[in-house]
Amino acid sequence: MDIREIIDYLKNYDGRPLKLMEVCGTHTAAIFKNGIRDLISPKIRLISGPGCPVCVTPTAYIDACTAFAKGENQELLTFGDMMKVPGMNGSLSENKTSANITVMYSPFEAIEKAKADPSKLIGVAAVGFETTVPAYALMLQQARKQGIGNIRLITALKTVLPALEWICENQNDVDGFICPGHVSVITGIHVYDELAAKYGKPFVVAGFEAEHILATVYRIVRQIETGESQSENLYRNAVRDDGNAKALAVIDEVFETGPAVWRGLGEIAGSGLYLRGEYAAYDGGSRGLSEDMELPAACRCGDVIVGRIDPDECPMFGKGCDPMAPYGPCMVSAEGSCGIWYRNKH
């Protein structure tokens, strides 16, 4: 089928109501940018899941980063999208005047800073899903090879698959998943096979152009209509079915899995990545960061993260919570659902 036939099919779909979840902030943005919702039947509802690593990072992690940055002769490197995430003791941005915090553009900046001043402890706020984990692993491999000992990694690195299983277990009304393209470049598509079989739901990997997303929605709908539940790869120009073997090997050498807390979901076994024994000396206090701030009842960030509501259904959306003054983490990041919805609606 060509794209016109796909649009015609989706626009005229009149089967049972369907709820399809994407778990990638770039997909969320692309769906808005290309007006995908206007091209499909109102019976096909597209919702956002836990696709933003910044948004699911717990309060305790922010506080741990702040505490490190306030240590004597210590400096914290972080990507800019972490600066406004609220912690129990304020955000990194709010603590910047009393803490040594630098916005980085690459984890490898830590090596140069550590070499420039061996007496200073350089902390790296490592937040992300499988897409960004190899960069942190390679940086630590390089530091270890060069005998650099004054780098510390504070990790909130997570893997997407356990969160998808949490959704399947706790959100029975999700009918199918638009799987993340960037993450799947690393993991491949076979990681979704077991979930598709166990829960009877389609898992289809999508690219980021309008036609990619529309084709993915079409394949999910067709699978549901024909009683199928399989994983499919519709992003073959970037995603290999078996993933990136070299990247996976690097991750496995440096990191091991353990429990991690996700905002909105709670603790999920095996979803966190922590430094293995031979790299443990580089850990900056990453384990056991489970405490999370209770947001006021009016803030429904947790419900947004798991797709229970759309961002504009939150009573604080645009009313005391916007990208300039975010209250919840979903409004902070460029990949956060609330931030994307706000920028596209205003």
Could you tell me what each predicted segment is?
Residues 1-119, 133, 143-146, 154, ...:
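Metallocofactor- and cofactor-centric catalytic cores in central/energy metabolism, strongly enriched
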Residues 125, 129-191:
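Phosphate/pyrophosphate-binding betaalpha-module
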Residues 19-20, 150-151, 226-236, 262-263, ...:
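Flexible, glycine/charged-enriched surface loops at secondary-structure junctions
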Residues 33-34, 90, 136-138, 190-191, ...:
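Short amphipathic alpha-helical segments
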Residues 24-27, 129-131, 157-161, 181-185, ...:
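Glycine-rich beta-alpha junction loops
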Residues 215-303:
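Internal helical hairpin/lid segments
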Residues 152, 171-237:
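A conserved active-site cap/scaffold subdomain adjacent to cofactor or substrate pockets
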